[in-house]
Each structure stands twice: as C-alpha cells, then as structure tokens.
C-alpha cells in the first residue's frame, strides 16, 4: 500500500495549488481520489493515514509562506523555520485525517460521498476555533478567483461554499471503482449545482451596480520591508513616506494607514506636529494602525495592537484594540512552559481587546474594524455587524514577501464583504490594498510591492442584510437538504430511464 500513500501525498501537494494566486482549479479533482481511497481502505487506521498524507501535502504547498515570515528575523528565529514549514502542516493535516477517519465508517452507506463532504466541512469548522483557530485556505476559497462564484457566500457563508466545492470536486470518485450509474448521478447533480451558482452569481451582479456614499477615502500603501519597519534609523523616513503618499492626491475625507503604521505613540511632540500638519493640509481624518497601552504601570501594564482615528484638532475619535491575536506572533501561548519570545517586535506580549464596532460621528459612519488576520474568521466578523456601514481591515503582509500569502489573505478578506453585504476598505503596509464593494467586486486596488496611494468613494452597504449575516451557518442545513433532493430526483430519473 505504499503506492497509494505516495499518491495521496503528491495529490495533496497538488491540491494546495487551488488557492490564490495560482487558482489551479483542475487540482480539485485530487479530492475524488482521496474520497475513493478512503472508501476502499481496509480499516479506519489505513483511511486515517491516507487522509493524513493528503492533508500534509495540502497544507505544505498551501501555507509554505508562513516560514518566510519566520525567516525575516532569521538570526533570532532560525530554529523556528522547520517548525513553520513542516510543523504547521503536520498539525493541520490532523483535521483532514480526522474527516477521512470519520468518513470511513460510512463507506458502505449509499450516501458515502455526501457524508465525506459533510465530514470535510465539519473539520474545517472545527479548525476555525480549536486552539484559537486557523480557518485559512478553507476549500471554498478555491472559487474566490471569480466574483460570480463567490456570490453564494451571501446565503450560505464560506462553510456552505466549501461544501459545494468539495461536493463537486469528489463527484468523479465512482470512476475509480467503475460505478458508472452513481457517476452519472453525481456528475449530473454537480453540473446542475454549478449551473445554479453561476446563474445566481451572474444575475446578482448584473442586477446590482455599486452604489457609493459621499465619503472619500484614501488608501496609503508604503510597502516598507519588514526589516526596516521597526528600525529606529528608518523611522522618520518611513513616517514621511506615509505622509507624502497621503498628501499627494486630491482632497479626501479619510486617510487610512496600515496595521502598526505608527510604531511609536502619536503624542510624541515631533510626531504629533507632523501628523497635525498633514491633517490640517488635507482637512482629513486619519485612521491608522498603531501601538496602544492602558497607561498603567508594573504588572497592570497592558499593550495592544490598535486602530484609531485622529482629526486635525488632535482629538482621538475612536480606538479599537485587536481582539483576535496571532499566537507566537503577537503573544506566546504557554509562556511558562515555552521559554521563547514572540515573533513581532518587543518583549511584551500584546493583550486582547474587546472587539465590537466603532463610530465616526462626523460622517455618521459605523465601522467594523479588523486588524490583520481577524478578517479570516467568518463568525467573528459576523458578530455585532448588523448596524455596521463598512469593514475597515488594516494589515501588514510585508512579512511574507512575494509569496502566496498576501494574495490568499486578500481573497479571504474580501469574502467577508460578500457574506455580510458590507463594503470593505483594506489597507496593507505591503500586500494588496483595495476598496471592495458589498458584492466582493474590487473598485480600487494597489498591488503587492506597489508604493503608492489610491482613493475613491466608500461604497454603500446593502439595503437589506444578507441571509448569512442574519442566520449564519444554519443556512448550510438548507443547502444539504437541497443537494440531497437533487440527488434523489436524479436517481429516480435514471431508474425510470432504465425501466
């Protein structure tokens, strides 16, 4: 059985290419082989091994770029590179392995393929919250290359779209065992489901043009290398680069800088002077990422990754503290056991904020703030967003260089706009900055490594909230019933034709 194991590993590596930026969609068919080999396994232990090898390859090629982030400070963290490159796939492979183990026990069920899809999505959901969660590269994001194909997110969310993708991708599995009747049913139902998605997405986009508010926003992307971002000698150069990019465009209402754009407190006199000069010359409000603390001393001192707004009168209009922190990056879990420092600058761990919305009174703008990878958590973004007008996502993807990471992050983030029917303003230090409408369409964009600013009007949110934003993942139950009904009807039709 070594040959199937090697095949599973290689196909897993190939399957990781279905995500941004390659979007090699034919690789989704690798899942048909996995579905087949799990069913043909002699015991659950063998099915577990097949799933694990596939999962290891899947995450190895899909999130290899995390090791690039670790290598930024290679002198201090050289030892962590193998853990980032191989250790994370070793852990994450357990979720695909577990889904295969569970599926094996339904190998003789006539709805085996359907159960396989359910198990896959179940463990994607588990992966989104266990051990703080990492719902990166859920299989549904393979469809994010197309504005049309991601429109179902407004109804069924990313887990529902994952179910559709995995269902279509495994529809060819009876081919390996020459079960041609079942193959006809699954292929026919997959074509029908895909056709419905395409029609729904195309009609939804063609019938809904982007409507805009009167609020002008400027996105500033300085693309500062991570090695220079916290360098004291580069501080004034970096600050002036932000300011020059902010001033060198038409008049605007809001200027948005990226995550931790201000690496020092904004009340330092020389810094404050330059910020106020910029804000007075542009007559704009600055929304920026920065570092904040609770103004206490000793053991009570707490440090936060923050997003806040400043006006030309030096008033802080709101302040948001990041509530979903990156383990090992922004804090060290099990710090009493693991004698290591966090990856990001500084010796002190960041503390969690409270999340929630912020309000910009001047423009009557209710904002759902998201810092960095908070945007990858669909349930977190959906929480308390029913009165929000816009999502503002600031990030710093300079860690990952010219790799798959920044592209994947962008497409994952814009999916939240479609799910919630909200426009998204996304600003990266380096990465992909964009204005995205509530249908996920990119209105303005700055590409990876581009040093520039761009601006436009903030799109309006949808008049009515999306079905997903109201009911969340419960809509997946309707999807399951719908696809089961399609399968049942197609089976009846084929039986009637044989008679």
From Swiss-Prot:
Its main location: membrane. It is a multi-pass membrane protein. Pathway: Protein modification; lipoprotein biosynthesis (N-acyl transfer). It is found in: Cell inner membrane. Pfam families: CN_hydrolase, LNT_N. GO terms for cellular component: plasma membrane. The chain crosses the membrane at residues 6-26, 50-70, 77-97, 114-134, 148-168, 183-203, 474-494. Keywords: Acyltransferase, Cell inner membrane, Cell membrane, Membrane, Transferase, Transmembrane, Transmembrane helix. GO terms for biological process: lipoprotein biosynthetic process. One of its GO terms (molecular function) is N-acyltransferase activity. InterPro entries: Apolipo_AcylTrfase, C-N_Hydrolase, C-N_Hydrolase_sf, LNT_N. Its EC number is 2.3.1.269. The keyword Cell inner membrane applies. The active site is at residues 259, 322, 372. Residues 220-465 form the CN hydrolase domain. Belongs to the CN hydrolase family. Apolipoprotein N-acyltransferase subfamily. PANTHER family: APOLIPOPROTEIN N-ACYLTRANSFERASE. Catalyzes the phospholipid dependent N-acylation of the N-terminal cysteine of apolipoprotein, the last step in lipoprotein maturation. HAMAP family: Lnt. This is Apolipoprotein N-acyltransferase. It comes from Rickettsia conorii (strain ATCC VR-613 / Malish 7). The lineage of its organism: Bacteria, Pseudomonadati, Pseudomonadota, Alphaproteobacteria, Rickettsiales.
